[in-house]
Amino acid sequence: VFKENLEARQLMRAVVVECKLPSLPSRAEEARAMAENIGYDVVDVMVQRRKSDHHSYFIGPGKVEELKEVVDANEVETVIFTNTLPSSQVFKLQQRLGGDVRVIDRNLLILEVFDKRAMTKEAKLQIKLAKLKYTLSWGREFIKLRGIMGEQVGWMGPGDYPFQEYYRAARSRISRLEAQLRDLDRKKEIARGRRRELGFPAVALAGYTQSGKTTFFNRVASESKRVGLGPFTTLSTFARKVRFGASQSSECILIDSIGFIEDMHPTIVKAFTATLGEIAHSDLILLFVDASEETPVIARRCLSMNKILREIDADGQVIVCANKIDLVDSEQVASVLEAIRERFVGTAVIPISALTGENLGELFAAITRNISNVKVTAGLPSTFVQARNPVRPE
């Protein structure tokens, strides 16, 4: 029912809509950027400020009429809400705007971005699982919208209610996807155990999407992974053996993983448990922060990252990397470092530029100090990749 043809939606016209509530930060520009990044032509961004959401449409009825005028005038095919919408509101909006107009919320937009970025079997399975779980309750409204809630003989089977049939089929598919992901997770656990046996500490890169993690990974591991393609360029984990200094004790496995995003729905976070598990099981976490962001945004995201690390039971040591200092002046760097240290009390915070290499020596030395107490029982193969500009211990 909800199968999406992403390729057919290239350059589809869309409108971004936000109901700006007092307690929520604006997501309008974030949604516009994500939508345009995966091929939508965003013709308008509409924002309505309200004390609370409307029970039928989230936005008020008058704003819905204004939205319909924009949709009709511009032949808009998709309406993207920055808010999280219950299924009943989605389908009431679709009824009012026209049956051919898709209405999605921020969570489904995120999943579309994921879908576009997915490169591995695991990522694709996780996306399918998240989408099925998130839209499971939508089946009844979807069927209502098309007026087929009674018994019917046809594709749903004789003598059964369509929703019940859909629900059973969806639950069965969810079970199969979960079983496949558990199998992949077991294989990852075996690989982690193998790394432990060889004595390689695991260093995981974590942080918000587009904070420079993959740029750092490419620089250190001499890789050419895609960067700068918008949110969620990395959806699966990538691991390489690297050395951050001259001694054998600086050898480790460097892991690049999926980027965080603020207020991600728990269903989506849970679907990516296996991927986030690489962060949770690492010996050291390099937590990347984009120092070029505004200080209030950085402060809010630091609190959010702290929460995510707690939710996934990450118990490794943490070094916060205030990245992209090449884009800001020294005064802003000082302000950013103060904001980070207030929210990561007792944690090392190091300003760097993964792009230019500025201050990477200090970071490499800190990494080496943190991982040197993990005993190495086997040397790194002769084909190991050495980090550029390795720090030589004094």
Task: Report each predicted region and the residues it spans.
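Short, charged, surface-exposed secondary-structure boundary motifs
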Residues: E112-R117, S236, L360-E362
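Flexible beta-alpha connector loops of hexameric P-loop NTPases
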Residues: K20-P22, D53-S56, R117, K121, ...
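Conserved C-terminal guanine-recognition region of P-loop GTPase G domains, centered on the G4
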Residues: A28-E36, K68-A73, I80, T84-G98, ...
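N-terminal accessory targeting/assembly segments
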Residues: V1-E112
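Conserved nucleotide-binding/hydrolysis micro-motifs of P-loop NTPases
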Residues: K20-S23, R50-S52, T84-S87, L108-E112, ...
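Short alpha-helix plus adjacent loop in nuclease-associated cores
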Residues: N107-I127
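Switch I (effector-binding) loop of TRAFAC-class P-loop GTPase G-domains
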Residues: F2, L198, V220-C252, M264-A274, ...
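C-terminal-of-GTPase-core extension/linker across diverse P-loop GTPases
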Residues: V1-V16, R32, K133-S211, F217-N218, ...
